[in-house]
């Protein structure tokens, strides 16, 4: 295999999906520890610790606004190059979070075993479903009193509609947690407390029968019964089903104590796919093609008001990035030179001179790059599957100075091109309705309108709870629909027809009465 093909085969690009507080920050930190990107755990602070972190990963770099390193972490593990993309939790949750999942080849789902499957996890899994993304699952927090593990598997299968294949099985829980049993290698790994900040060689015992004394007779007998049940009731791991997104291997442990994380990472790097081919409008692009192609899935604004610079996150789909190379911007038809792309290496932030399929690079963007833009080395090619997602929170924008309406419209449309919010212009009023997935986005927009466009605005409630894009192949039926439902219709910032529903029932009735109209929760960029 050539050096070029080896580099591609090494890459594993993924994101972690979880509900806030399920342990994403902790598990990220342990992965960085195993990847030698940090020396001891406990250096990554989550928001509630009071550190000003722009994501959960690094302290804010006040000198240059947002720390770009927080959004992508690259580190080596087991002969692989891991690209871990951040999916923010809590109040900075936005459409970006959803769209990041379109740039990965697999995902790690972290479930809080005390609480089970939660709301945010369901939403993120629905996005993974759009591309049948392979999912690995880590059941976290077994050093606490958790739900019954069989019950947890049942819940994942019923709510998330994915088969579970347990790879290991917990021995006890909470203060009686003794370790995990590897179902495929007949090996017990014994748990000890107090090693969360380091890589610790937990004791292993080959053969379940040989671990009887170490775990105690009562737990041993319970475990034997559980294993019989599990083997009878759950699914065997099947690599093909995993790669098709139909089955998830499940690992148990506690990220805080750094127990079970290594086993999960070993399985992840073994089974998760290398960079996959990508669908474009003209053809399918293979990861091992020689020419550089890729797309922008996220734009991050600089928080430093003196610099209107933005960073466009570019997922390489094929070819090799080299410093100083020229690329073709498909939407504008112009050539663009990449002189100083940012590359992301956890721990060391040196400018790496090259990147391969699966890698993410940051392009400096002064307003010319939009989410969903494709770049090639000359071929006219647009990648598909980088969607806009229907917002979930809506507010009416109130302008403090009516003479600034033009500046407000320009600002809202430009900011919506960055993908954090969406703007809607209703048919029957001069209102501007702003929609977002996360509540923080409204504050960010108001702040940036004031500082970058010199427009002051506030918000008020609006009778909208759901938005759906409208598509129809029959022009007459579409025109009839527009006349009948004009009170609910609007155009989004890019000019697409949208239905703004006051209630879920209203939307359902409109869909039932108009079977030829497509009401879509996503639209392509």
From Swiss-Prot:
Name of this chain's protein: Peptide chain release factor 3
Keyword Transport tagged: no
Pfam families: EF-G_D2, GTP_EFTU, RF3_C
One of the GO biological process terms: regulation of translational termination
Localisation per UniProt entry: Cytoplasm
PANTHER family recorded: PEPTIDE CHAIN RELEASE FACTOR RF3
Lineage per the UniProt record: Bacteria, Pseudomonadati, Pseudomonadota, Gammaproteobacteria, Thiotrichales
Cited function: Increases the formation of ribosomal termination complexes and stimulates activities of RF-1 and RF-2. It binds guanine nucleotides and has strong preference for UGA stop codons. It may interact directly with the ribosome. The stimulation of RF-1 and RF-2 is significantly reduced by GTP and GDP, but not by GMP.
Binding positions (GTP): 18-25, 86-90, 140-143
Keyword set includes Ubl conjugation: no
InterPro entries: EF-G-like_DII, EFG_III/V, G_TR_CS, P-loop_NTPase, PrfC, RF3_C, RF3_dom_3_sf, RF3_GTP-bd
Residues covered by the tr-type G domain: 9-276
HAMAP family per the UniProt record, alphabetical: Rel_fac_3
GO cellular component, one term: cytosol
A GO MF label: GTP binding
Family: Belongs to the TRAFAC class translation factor GTPase superfamily. Classic translation factor GTPase family. PrfC subfamily.
Alphabetized UniProt keyword annotations: Cytoplasm, GTP-binding, Nucleotide-binding, Protein biosynthesis
């Amino acid at each position: 295999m050539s050096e070029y093909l080896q580099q591609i085969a090494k890459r594993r690009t993924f994101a972690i999906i979880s509900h806030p507080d399920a342990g994403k920050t902790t598990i990220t930190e342990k992965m960085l520890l195993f990847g030698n990107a940090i020396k001891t755990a406990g250096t990554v602070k989550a928001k509630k610790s009071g550190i000003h972190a722009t994501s959960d990963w690094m302290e804010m770099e006040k000198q240059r606004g947002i720390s770009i390193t927080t959004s992508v972490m690259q580190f080596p593990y087991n002969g692989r190059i891991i690209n871990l993309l951040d999916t923010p939790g809590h109040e900075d949750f936005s459409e970006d979070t959803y769209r990041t999942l379109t740039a990965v080849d697999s995902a790690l789902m972290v479930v809080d075993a005390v609480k089970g499957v939660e709301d945010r996890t369901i939403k993120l899994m629905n996005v993974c479903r759009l591309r049948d993304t392979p999912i690995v699952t880590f059941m976290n927090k077994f050093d606490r009193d958790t739900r019954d593990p069989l019950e947890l598997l049942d819940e994942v299968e019923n709510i998330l509609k994915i088969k579970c294949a347990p790879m290991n099985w917990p021995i006890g829980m909470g203060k009686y947690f003794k370790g995990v049993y590897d179902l495929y290698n007949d090996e017990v790994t014994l748990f000890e407390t107090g090693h969360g900040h380091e890589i610790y060689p937990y004791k292993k015992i080959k053969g379940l029968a040989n671990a009887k004394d170490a775990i105690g007779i009562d737990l041993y007998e319970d475990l034997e019964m559980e294993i019989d049940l599990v083997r009878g009731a759950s699914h065997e791991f099947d690599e093909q089903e995993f790669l098709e997104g139909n089955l998830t291997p499940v690992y148990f442990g506690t990220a805080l104590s750094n127990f079970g994380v290594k086993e999960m990472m070993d399985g992840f790097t073994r089974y998760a796919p290398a960079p996959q081919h990508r669908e474009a409008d003209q053809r399918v692009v293979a990861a091992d093609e020689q020419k550089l192609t890729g797309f922008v899935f996220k734009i991050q604004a600089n928080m430093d008001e003196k610099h209107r610079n933005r960073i466009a996150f570019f997922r390489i789909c094929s070819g090799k990035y080299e410093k100083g190379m020229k690329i073709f911007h498909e939407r504008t038809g112009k050539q663009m030179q990449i002189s100083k792309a940012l590359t992301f290496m956890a721990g060391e932030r040196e400018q790496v001179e090259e990147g391969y399929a699966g890698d993410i690079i940051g392009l400096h963007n002064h307003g010319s790059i939009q989410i969903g833009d494709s770049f090639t080395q000359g071929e006219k090619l647009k990648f598909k599957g980088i969607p806009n997602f229907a917002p979930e929170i809506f507010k009416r924008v109130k302008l403090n100075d009516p003479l600034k309406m033009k500046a407000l419209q320009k600002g809202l449309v430009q900011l919506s091109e960055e993908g954090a919010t969406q703007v809607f212009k209703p048919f029957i009023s001069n209102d501007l309705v702003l929609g977002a997935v996360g509540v923080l986005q409204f504050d960010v927009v108001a702040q940036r309108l004031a500082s970058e466009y010199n427009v002051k605005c506030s918000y008020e409630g609006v009778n909208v709870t759901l938005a759906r894009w409208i598509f129809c192949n029959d022009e007459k039926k579409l025109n009839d629909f527009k006349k009948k439902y004009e009170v609910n219709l609007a155009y989004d910032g890019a000019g697409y027809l949208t239905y703004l529903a006051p209630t879920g029932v209203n939307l359902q009735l409109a869909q039932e009465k108009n079977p030829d109209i497509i009401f879509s929760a996503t639209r392509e960029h």
